Amino acid sequence: PNLTEACMLTGMPYREDGWSKADFLKMTDKLRELGADKIVISGLNSTSYITNVVSETPGEIKFLRQKRVGKVRSGTGDIFAAVIASDCVNGYPLENSVKKAAAFVRDCILATEKRDIPPTDGVCFEDVLYRLKV
């Protein structure tokens, strides 16, 4: 889930910032109680970076950062999740998949900005789809 969805699922109050590692450990514990095994909390925004929280083992989390590019666009979360889901069914390691998905979304945003597409029209993933080939 993204942060908003994770808050809704766990009953934790949403806030824009001020999240600690302990907060995310608590959140991933609550998501595990709901049946999740491996967890990605996507799209934590800061001025310069997008961060994804990854937890494959109870009590452990990693923060994977990607340089922020372009405008906020519709559909990026769906693309991010689709790359991870595809890799998951193909046995690809989760941490590597999250890095791959974040890089792919970044490339989609850059390709879309180049075409001057309005942010509400999503992203031009077709231009960079070939980069997902294994």
Regions inferred by a protein language model and the residue ranges of each:
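Conserved phosphate/ATP/ADP-binding segment of small-molecule kinases
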Residues: 1-61
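Glycine-rich beta-alpha junction loops
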Residues: 5, 43-47, 67-70, 101-106
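Short, small-residue alpha-helix embedded
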Residues: 8, 71-94
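Phosphate-handling active-site elements
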Residues: 60-62, 87-101
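Short pre-catalytic strand/loop immediately N-terminal to key active-site residues, enriched for Gly-Thr
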Residues: 61-75
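Charged C-terminal helix
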Residues: 95-134
